[in-house]
């Protein structure tokens, strides 16, 4: 497809929107980019240098602009006026993911990882497995670097491992991963999707354009993901911590075993040998193993990476030990399910820092889990009162409502004793106080390391 002279409207100027606008302008398209919010002057100047026409503080009228194509950013709800009007006029609406897919060099094989929790860890692990096996592989997508920004690094015939979100999958029209994995589905982003059913349907779209020779990897222990197998046109592999599925990965006396339907059972390693700890990371490791085996990675090489892969930043990331207290950064825990997995990954007494902006979640189950695990609960941000109510109903009395994030970290440190863990796992989004979960995690690490320096 020739982009020269094509009129493209980019709606939303977050990371992926800016990357899409820049790439399209370089390809010769006439790009108009808009956002309701203001942008930093440096970002504006970079876009202007590429010839992008900017509209800030609102949206242009699609009927007047008459673009050939609309690119939507993940943070823009699908019902926003320019997107709805474009669809009504028959103008294609793509996500940045769809755009990047269409711009890939020939022969590239795509692995797509989605799910409510574990996406980034599993995506990073899959990429590392391929790279350590000597395969040309690029990791990107929702993991932090928009895929369209990495196109120059992707060679013909190579591999792309991308983390994909429900928001990105809403606006795909041909995105075709040779291997797609849905790790788990629990209520999340319901403020955006409107219902759990809509959220599940968005996640399932990762398999929408697969073919019979492709692979879909699903969590057998999760009823939502397991139920999606019937709609898959590709070969389905399951992973399970509890029982042996028809085909896929399971545990046998603690050893990870895999059967893809040809070649018999492959035994990898004991789950205690995995570098990533916690039951949720066992699931992530099993999913990554199936991805690798489906692509043809040597089992011995795969096992070596499973045993040595380091922790991913902001996912149960050890920060420091101060006076016998271990500090853990789990800023990526942006929903109750993620935080429940985090607090159950350790047996030590926990001081938990939680709170932020609720994404439509119910905190009841989380509070019940905290009641048996958390010795002191420090709450901060917009959802602090809502979390406090759920916690008190669950019988938790040791609660502190912090006026700001730094106060929350100081309170948690003061409440901890040698042998305890202070964990940031907010169960909420970061947007009430920070740009993103990465910034929140970085601030937490900075505050902890400052305490260590102060002695």
From Swiss-Prot:
InterPro entries: AlaDH/PNT_NAD(H)-bd, Folylpolyglutamate_synth_CS, Mur-like_cat_sf, Mur_ligase_C, Mur_ligase_C_dom_sf, Mur_ligase_cen, MurD. Pfam families: AlaDh_PNT_C (PF01262), Mur_ligase_C (PF02875), Mur_ligase_M (PF08245), MurD-like_N (PF21799). GO terms for biological process: cell division; cell wall organization; peptidoglycan biosynthetic process; regulation of cell shape. The keyword Nucleotide-binding applies. It is an enzyme of class 6 (ligase). GO terms for cellular component: cytoplasm. Its main location: cytoplasm. Pathway: Cell wall biogenesis; peptidoglycan biosynthesis. It is found in: Cytoplasm. ATP binds at residues 115-121. GO terms for molecular function: ATP binding; tetrahydrofolylpolyglutamate synthase activity; UDP-N-acetylmuramoylalanine-D-glutamate ligase activity. The keyword ATP-binding applies. Keywords: ATP-binding, Cell cycle, Cell division, Cell shape, Cell wall biogenesis/degradation, Cytoplasm, Ligase, Nucleotide-binding, Peptidoglycan synthesis. It catalyses: UDP-N-acetyl-alpha-D-muramoyl-L-alanine + D-glutamate + ATP = UDP-N-acetyl-alpha-D-muramoyl-L-alanyl-D-glutamate + ADP + phosphate + H(+). Its EC number is 6.3.2.9. Cell wall formation. Catalyzes the addition of glutamate to the nucleotide precursor UDP-N-acetylmuramoyl-L-alanine (UMA). Belongs to the MurCDEF family. This is UDP-N-acetylmuramoylalanine--D-glutamate ligase. It comes from Moorella thermoacetica (strain ATCC 39073 / JCM 9320). The lineage of its organism: Bacteria, Bacillati, Bacillota, Clostridia, Moorellales.
């Amino acid at each position: 497809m020739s982009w020269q002279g094509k009129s493209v409207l980019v709606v939303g100027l977050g990371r992926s929107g800016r990357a899409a606008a820049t790439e399209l302008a370089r390809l010769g398209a006439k790009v108009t980019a808009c956002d309701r919010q203001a942008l930093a002057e440096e970002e504006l100047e970079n876009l202007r240098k590429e010839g992008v026409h900017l509209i800030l503080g609102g949206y242009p009228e699609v009927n007047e602009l008459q673009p050939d194509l609309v690119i939507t950013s993940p943070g823009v709800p699908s019902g926003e006026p320019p997107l709805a009007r474009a669809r009504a006029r028959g103008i294609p609406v793509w996500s940045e993911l769809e755009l990047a897919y269409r711009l890939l060099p020939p022969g590239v094989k795509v692995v797509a990882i989605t799910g409510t929790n574990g996406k980034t860890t599993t995506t990073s692990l899959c990429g590392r497995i391929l790279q350590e096996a000597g395969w040309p592989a690029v990791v990107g997508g929702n993991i932090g670097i928009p895929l369209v920004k990495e196109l120059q690094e992707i060679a013909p015939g190579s591999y792309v491992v991308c983390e994909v979100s429900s928001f990105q999958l809403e606006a795909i029209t041909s995105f075709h991963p040779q291997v797609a994995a849905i790790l788990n589905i629990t209520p999340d982003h319901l403020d955006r999707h409107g219902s759990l059913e809509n959220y599940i349907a968005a996640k399932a779209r990762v398999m929408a354009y697969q073919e019979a020779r492709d692979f879909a990897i699903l969590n057998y222990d999760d009823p939502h993901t397991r139920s999606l197998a019937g709609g898959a046109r590709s070969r389905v592999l399951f992973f399970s911590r509890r029982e042996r599925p028809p085909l896929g990965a399971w545990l046998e006396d603690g050893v990870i075993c895999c059967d893809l339907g040809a070649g018999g059972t492959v035994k990898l390693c004991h789950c205690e040998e995995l570098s990533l700890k916690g039951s949720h990371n066992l699931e992530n490791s099993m999913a990554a193993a199936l991805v690798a085996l489906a692509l043809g990675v040597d089992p011995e090489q795969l096992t070596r990476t499973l045993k040595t892969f380091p922790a991913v930043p902001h996912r149960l990331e050890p920060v420091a030990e101060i006076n016998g207290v271990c500090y853990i950064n789990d800023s990526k825990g942006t929903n109750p399910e993620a935080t429940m997995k985090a607090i159950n990954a350790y047996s030590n007494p926990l001081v938990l820092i939680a709170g932020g902006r609720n994404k439509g979640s119910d905190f009841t189950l989380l509070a019940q889990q905290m009641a048996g695990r958390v010795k002191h609960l420090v709450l901060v941000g917009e959802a602090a009162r809502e979390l406090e109510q759920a916690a008190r109903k669950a019988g938790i009395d040791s609660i502190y409502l912090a006026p700001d994030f730094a106060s929350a970290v100081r309170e948690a440190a003061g409440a901890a004793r040698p042998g305890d863990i202070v964990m940031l796992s907010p169960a909420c989004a970061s947007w009430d106080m920070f740009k993103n979960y990465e910034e929140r995690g970085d601030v937490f690490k900075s505050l902890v390391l400052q305490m260590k320096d102060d002695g």
